[in-house]
Amino acid sequence: MEQEQDCDRMGSVGQTMTNGGMQAMRILICAHDFQPNPSPQSLRVTQLASGLASLGHDVHVLTRACGAGMRRMEDPPGLQVHRTSPQGVEALIDVTSRVLGHLRRLRRQDAVAGTRPSPQVASQAAPTAGTAALNRKGRAIAWLRSFLDARVFPDGRSRWIGGALRHGRQLISQWSPQVIIGSHEPVAGLLLASALSRESGIPFVAELGDPVLTSYTPERWRAASLELERRVCHEAAAIVVTSEATAALMQERHGPGIAPLSVIPQGFARVEPPLPEVVRSAGGLQLVYTGRFYPFRDPMPLVRAVLASPGCTLTIAGPGLPPELAKACAEHPQVLRFAGSLDHSQAIELQRSADVLVNIGNAGMTQIPGKLLEYLGSGRPVLYLQPDAADPAAAIIGRERCGFLAANEVAAISALLHELLQRKQQGRLDEGLRLGQDAFAEYRWDRLAERLAAVCRDAAMAGQRQA
């Protein structure tokens, strides 16, 4: 009887064949963050969804309507993307933010008289009475969003779930997906997928990425986060995390009865045809850091080490800087260069121009920075700054021979920078390292999507679990 049920489930997965000769699946992905949202999770979901579609699967994405300030982009080919508004106050905030953003752009155009700032420096246009008024309104919106976040678990993004749930029910009745993927972070995608799965009986895959309960979870939501994490781990047909350390943490927290765990790390996009070689400066050591800064990633030991190392420069690209780092960039513009926020293709181009790419580990956490694995596709060595002995990402540097490792301390970084300067002067900077996309093909998003497809197929056969 069990064998007959398994055959029935496999038969229900569909008769269309994928590019690899397997039966195609109908997959619904629930993700609050999706292209053009610039968040790291948006990049992950967009790449994995595109990879599933490229394999021949029928993939629909249920996501939030584009927020204010997001650059309009075409949806990735092969995907059906359904965007729903959060409604209510969140929708009003979106509209107000768009209006303020448009007014800011007009002010900037007037201030710079039609010129554009260099992509390597931050714009320093002086504020006017008009921009001050816009800043006050922007702060008021930020305060309102913070106020609303404090009253919804775990933040205001969960207000998107209501409208998305109604659209998801309609989509399921018309299209009948065989598996649902819930994306985290934020929690909204996970909550939506879980609700749709319970209502429909369709199994869901918890694409956790990182734990729901983390070191930065607000105290008021810690108990609720742990309970949601527990329920999802027992209710989902499969769980996906980004590191072995996170998988071990889930088993330790929630016991051996949880759903099957798979580790699918972050990755990088395949580039075809291969990009041309970059001609780099013969003098000095050019360091590049792309990405965000968080309270658990301290950039100041790196900054102090660079300032103490003649011949080194550091270019930073990201959505913003911590105050102390912003001050240092303003005081040392020839050494510390802030490129501002770049789109993904611009960030990749900047990475390829570097002598060495810098990544800072997450202190006290099991997560591996996604940027570290993205760097593997750039063809450049990585300087990884290890925050503590338990950091799981540090092992990647030694195992993959992709760069250099130092404690996130000024003395250790300074000593390594001195060594790297010498290696470059001697023409040995890349010596002994594995570099380039071909060396790390297992981290390409298209390969990772194949692994996610296998997880989805197993989940569809296993069926829905009960929490």
Model-derived segments and spans:
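Acidic donor-binding loop of glycosyltransferase active sites
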Residues: 237, 351-367, 380-383
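A short, active-site helix/loop in glycosyltransferases that binds the activated sugar's phosphate group
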Residues: 230-259
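N-terminal subdomain of nucleotide-sugar transferases
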Residues: 2-4, 9-90, 96, 238, ...
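Carbohydrate-associated surface elements
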Residues: 245, 266-267
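Conserved donor-binding/catalytic core segment of Leloir-type glycosyltransferases
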Residues: 279-297, 303-306, 452
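Nucleotide-sugar donor phosphate/pyrophosphate-binding loop at the beta->alpha transition
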Residues: 200-205, 213-231, 270, 295
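Nucleotide-activated donor-binding/catalytic signature segment of Leloir-type glycosyltransferases, i.e.
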Residues: 316-318, 323-348
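Membrane-proximal helix-turn-helix segments that form the acceptor-binding/catalytic region
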Residues: 47-48, 166, 188-191, 195-198, ...
